[in-house]
Amino acid sequence: MTASTRTFTAGRIVALALIGLALLALAYLRFAPEDTVSVPAGAKAGDLTLEPCTYATEDGGYAADCGTLVVPENRADPQSRLIALPVTRVHARSDHPREPVFRLQGGPGKTNMQFTYASRFADDRDVVFVGYRGLDGSVRLDCPEVESALKHTTDLVGEKSSRAYADAFRSCADRHTDDGVDLAGYGVVPQVDDLEAARVALGYDRIDLVSESAGTRKAMIYAWRYPEHLHRSVMIGVNPPGHFLWDGKTTGEQLGRYAARCSEDDTCSGRTDDLAASVRSGSADIPDRWLFLPIKEGNVRLASFYGLAETTSESAPLSSSMTLGSWLSAAEDDASGFWFQSVLADIAFPTAFVWGEYASVARADAQAAADYFAAGGRERSTNLGVAATAFGWGGGRMLDGWPAAANEGEYTSVQPTNVETLLVGGELDTATPPQWATRDLLPQLPNGRQVVLPGFGHSDSFWEDQPEAGTRLITAFFDSGKVDDSLYKPQQVDFTPDVTLTSLAKGFAGAMLGLGILAVLSLLWMARRVRKRGAFGRKSAATLRTLYPIVLGLGGWFVGVLIVLTTMPGTPLDDQLLAALSVGLPIG
């Protein structure tokens, strides 16, 4: 049989095998189990087992202990089963360490076990991480139902999405309950009690806390529940009770601060007389397409809100400079940046959190959310902050989708505490505006101090920009209770980033179109070449088998993506059938 008539050539078999391997890899990445801890045999509540390990930091590996803490799943139930949480203690390099620093990550829905900046405090302090229940431990409240609902939506902030989001939470909660999980034992207060259990097990008398964003809520509650064991507390991006949601007025205030910075910048002020007004008017009239590519307006508002939170370039492409640039370009009739944000939101947000843990912690503000949506919060989604709230709470429907924790209403308002506390906020932070801390928390802190950093955004901006100044600010407060912000220099807002969302959009769209067209033309050329001249020679065939599966595979996938983007907006871009057909058909 000649090469021109064989159904499965060697090259085709290899190509199909590669497709199969790629699909297996996609399946593994999607369904592979996470590394988890487990309850040791015979363990009882309060048991802690540790063994030497190395903890990775920005300055290399540090000697540490890693192990497992055993705690009740529901402390209100004497018959509760036990669960396990990971604990890591990074050893101080001093022979006479000060009070240990316990770290509290934000989120919610984010791990508490990763903190590359630990080396900034480990010279004379142990740095301790206690895994968040529902996320880091033996019970992980994954919600693939929520991920799927968000991936298949036609707009992340649409009504249809909100209903699917709430239904998915309900299905996820039912599944975990059927699996024996007591969801009443999860939430912010149980996580705080886990922190205290770790302190006791490690033998520390008093500890320091460094927290950020949603983690600051846990630091507050720890100070209210266990003040005698808390030495000092530093909160970055403060989130007092009632603020797991955003209102339009405060978001507008933050936009006004950006506008003031813009008016002082020649490039920015040359593009708009009033940045805040440009964003407000643009948000009310987001175009539905860039060229032939659809734009999901809710996605744009959601991505823009989170993009405005961080001023550091390290947060790109969700950084304030790139985000604001897309709005100014849209006002100049270039909506390419909006299209890129729309696609980016579809890709990033469905898998951004461990959704069950997210819901269990967010429900600490269930009453505030209920009041907000009862007052009409669903109706004002053109404001970026309101859009973010609508997404996070499913338009208020998540309240009915995830069950309440036993003690979720215990800390719905700020309580006074004498703990020495430093509140740190970025002037331009939209996620946790510093005026929240000034108005709601600081008056209840007789020994509290606040530092608002001009030109800074949310917590990533604090850690990434002027790190020496930030480290001095924290360590000086832990050492003496004094505020030392002397190393800070004026922080400029960059309105001219090296890479813009519009350039990324045009590059990405151009690559998809170019490779897609190349794949189609290549297939047409090869078919015509075989019809006219017969089979390729040995060298030509070898070259095609080696190089063209890459061209045809990528080009075919891009053609598939373009078809999905333009005609099937509810189909996720990581859909396995999409990958199999769009990559497999051109190669096979």
Predicted regions and their residues:
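Catalytic-loop region of hydrolases
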Residues: T2-E159, L275-V279, P467, T471, ...
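Short beta-strand/loop motif that positions the catalytic acidic residue
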Residues: T417, L423-G425, D429
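Conserved alpha/beta-hydrolase "acid-adjacent" motif
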Residues: T430-W436
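A catalytic-pocket lid/entrance helix-loop region that shapes and gates access to the active site
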Residues: C143, S148-H152, A219-G282, S304, ...
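Post-His helix in hydrolase/transferase enzymes
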Residues: W436, S461-D479
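Histidine-bearing beta->alpha loop at or near hydrolase active sites
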Residues: P454-F462
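Conserved acidic catalytic loop of the alpha/beta-hydrolase fold
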Residues: T177, V189-R206
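Alpha/beta-hydrolase fold active-site neighborhood
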Residues: T9-A15, L21, L26-D35, A276-P416, ...
